[in-house]
Amino acid sequence: MIDRSSRPRILVGTTNPHKVVELGALLDGLGCQLVLPTDAGLEGFDVDETGDTLMANAILKAMAFAARAGMPALADDSGLEVDALGGEPGVRSRRYAGDDASDADRIALVLSKLDGVPVGSRTARFRSVIALAEPGRLVGTGTGTVDGVIGDMARGTNGFGYDPIFLMGDRSMAELTPAEKNATSHRSRAVASIRPILEAWLSAQGHVGDDAMPSRT
């Protein structure tokens, strides 16, 4: 029987409930106890994403959450890069249509800007950066990218963000099951990238993972 109470605690530094669910599934088996901001007394705490890159924002958020909570924190920043839009929305993906815009608003803006652009020129990628920090110290980062094409309409209900217009083969990312998405997504690849750093950090705390996590390429 594993004594879960003795596991190292890591704060999930995000207010996005969809990211909480995905990161929880992707980090399962590492031998750590994931803590939500609400469970750490951080209701309403958010970090201004003032960095000019996804890497800068992921580090900024991990460091800020770790400092505020007084415990290690893991944070993600992700973005959609559309080649025909010069890499936009990129680091501004969440704020692309304004601070108070919905996912539907952001999707509509991207599709309007791509109106008339042929499918062969609608190449895009999702990029994710994950950072692990202790209070006052960055432990490490991981990155992940997945390539696709922007469709001409929203499809599927399983995803969030820009997932409904991001096509991987003949399906949008929002048409994938959660298990399928977690096996192929940019965030899963970022977790795989940072996994050795997490394992080394956990080992230094005297803990090892519960089981092996499938590798992703």
PLM feature segments, named:
Residues I2-L11, P17-P37, G41-T217:
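Anionic-ligand binding patches
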